[in-house]
Structures are given as C-alpha cells and as structure tokens.
C-alpha cells in the first residue's frame, strides 16, 4: 500500500479545519413544556422576537419571550395536540397578514385567513402586523372632515381624517352603534366612480365579542350595502388570547395599505379593553412581572404603538389618512381606571357615552360636557362651525342651570328661556340608529334649533318638526342643500333662503 505524504497532509488539514465544529441547534427546537396556550421551546437560538414558528401538527405560534435557555411561544390555536418533545420549526418570517382591495367585503381572522366561507382571499401583498408608525416629517395636521352622520358628534365633537377619537362608556351604552353608524354614513362617498380622495374604506376589528354579535354586525353591513367597502377582522371570545391581542394590529396593517397608497381609511377597534385583558393573560403566563391591576408594564406602549399608526400623511407621501375610533368599555362609569386613562391620554379626544343618558332616551347617549375633540374643529366645515358654535355654549349653560333649577321654582324669564332652549336642543340632538344625516341636512336642522324655531314647540313635537322640515328641504329646496354642500359655508343668500324656508315650514307646521 502506497502512502503519499501529500494525501496525509490533506486529510490532517481537513480534520484540523473541522475541529471543534459542533452541530448547531438553531432552526429546529423542541417543546419543553406546553399549557395555557404557551409553549416553552428549547433551541431556536436565532429566532427573532415576533417571528412566526410552526409546530409539528401545523399549528402556528409567535416567539415573544427570548430567554437564555428557552423561547416562550404563544400559540395561535389549540395547544391540545402539542406535546412535550415535539419539534418546532422557524419560518423566518415576522407575523404578517394579506392586505389590499381583495379583502374588501370579507370577514377574516387575526392572521388574515377568511372565515366567511367565500373562498380564498385575493391579496397581492402581505404586510407585517407590527410596524413603526410614521414619523413627524411625513405627517400633516388633520384638516379634512370625517363625517359620522350623527348630529351630536359632527356638530359638537367633530372628527377629522387622520384623527384618533376614543369612544368610551359602560356596557350597553351604544358604543358599537355609534361606530356602526359612522361606517354606514360613508356609503354615499364610496359610490362607484367617486374620486379616491373622497372615498373612505372601513376596517372593523371585533375583539373578544360573541360570535353571534359579530355575525349580526356583518349582517347589518351587508343589508345596508356597506360591506363592499369594509373589512371585518374578528377575534371572538372563543379565540385564543394571542389572536385577540393580534387582531387590532392586523386590522391596522390592512388600513395602512390604503393610507400609504394615497387613499383614506377608517379603523374601529371594538374594543381595546379586551385586547388589554388578552395581553395581560399572555404576559402573566409568560411570567412577565405584573404592574398596576396586574397589567404588564408595557400595556401603555401596546396601545400607543397601535394608535400612533393612525395618521394624516402630507402631499409628498400621497396625502392618505388612517382615522382610528378605538372603543373602551368602562366599569360603572369609572374613567379613571388604568386602561381608560391610558387610552384617553393617547387619543386626540373622546366621545363619552353615559348609561344614565341612554336610559333617559337620549341616544346617542353622548355626554357633551365630558366629550372633547382636540383636533377635529380644524376639520369641521365652515357652515357647521357657523351654526354649531352657539349650540355648544347654550348646552353648557343649560346643564349648569338645569342643576340649579331643581332647587328653585321662581325662575326669571331669561333663565326659563335658556332652560327651554336647552331642552329642545337636547331633543334635537337625538337620533335613531341607521339614520345618518348628510352634513348639509345637519346644518339646516341645527340652524333651526339655535335660531328659536323650536322654542315654542312642545318637546314631543321637536322630532316631528325635524323630520317634516328635512322632507320639505329635500323635496322643495334641494338646490339650497346642494349649495351648502358644495360651498361648505352659509353665505348671506343661503341664510336668507334658509330663513324663508324655515318661516314657511313653521307656519304650515303650526
């Protein structure tokens, strides 16, 4: 046997080169323990925070806790079939969802999978659910109105495109009803052939609600013809906590597609209290230290990074916008609890709904004194500013006097007049569900209220007067409504014509 020196040196070199190279346990891990929707996984050394991983049975999860010797994974689905010792694969992708127009008219879960039985989603693009919000430079101040069709809100607490306005109140105070009316009111803007700058696409995120409630909501959207410009993201009460935590982020990513492409979108998170509860559950199971009310320390950051993504972009960035209406449920009207105060401080104002008002029949049950819109007034059209400026002051005076009036019966004429006017304005701001009003119709109705046309009417005739007057305006004075809509202000001529129309109608109504 011939031994060549060159061969020996080559073998030795190869062995020296490979010396000390152990096999890396990085791309595949092993389940150490599993329970309560959380898996502890050994291995996966190079996994990224927020990365999607896949278990042996195809169930997916998200790596949240990266510790020295193991990874804490939250499971998107049931953990029943996951057992100790099973393998876990990295996917290499951060959690993302499909986005685009293909989602309009569909109901999806928090991962963007269709749950409405209408076949697969036709999406051309996928986006990460958790991305950084736009910085200061790409933004522009809010200046275009986002009409909800509700007089109490559009007149007193106006919302602009790109604003974050919180809807807060106890259970059963009509929070979802306000959000639903806001979606339905966008129908005239989303007609075929309308310019993109006018349209407003809607994303509704249902977190921790009953399936029957979500089904009812979708049915209403369908019946009213609003589903075609809406996306519904549902993580219901029976879904695992990670899905409820993820749904608002997924919905925001879908809304951002429109914002970043020069279009306008509205996202409604219904509701963020349930998302916070789901996040608390996940955090405690992952053994993160609890803080106030057992919420983790970063629950403020959870909501701030979510809501900061709603923005109005400047013209260089396409001038798109994403408006957010987060919903928070309070317990016994306690606005000073942890999550409500957090979200109030993040948003640009709040619409405060009160159960007492709701039971008095004032619906929408907006407490005008506690509700504010910090940026919306610059988005309000001039015509509405002209008529609504008065109503706010008069209602504030009315509330103050109404408290005193309970104690004394001998009131002077001016006080009596103010109380009279306030009661009628309160009556005027009532509105039935599914009957949103166009902004020009709101303007003429509020003009009638602030100019004394309702003062001598019995309270129970105010709604009747309003309905009759609107019918008269639509049938005989449509040109005046069109003028207000196009010019967006009440000129001297418009005011003269409106006064004439009101005088004529008031005579015939009496």
Curated annotation (Swiss-Prot):
Disulfide bonds: none annotated. It comes from the Bacteria. Pfam families: ATP-synt_ab, ATP-synt_ab_C, ATP-synt_ab_N. ATP binds at residues 169-176. Its EC number is 7.1.2.2. GO terms for molecular function: ADP binding; ATP binding; proton-transporting ATP synthase activity, rotational mechanism. Belongs to the ATPase alpha/beta chains family. F-type ATPases have 2 components, CF(1) - the catalytic core - and CF(0) - the membrane proton channel. CF(1) has five subunits: alpha(3), beta(3), gamma(1), delta(1), epsilon(1). CF(0) has three main subunits: a(1), b(2) and c(9-12). The alpha and beta chains form an alternating ring which encloses part of the gamma chain. CF(1) is attached to CF(0) by a central stalk formed by the gamma and epsilon chains, while a peripheral stalk is formed by the delta and b chains. This is ATP synthase subunit alpha. It comes from Azorhizobium caulinodans (strain ATCC 43989 / DSM 5975 / JCM 20966 / LMG 6465 / NBRC 14845 / NCIMB 13405 / ORS 571). The lineage of its organism: Bacteria, Pseudomonadati, Pseudomonadota, Alphaproteobacteria, Hyphomicrobiales. The gene is atpA.
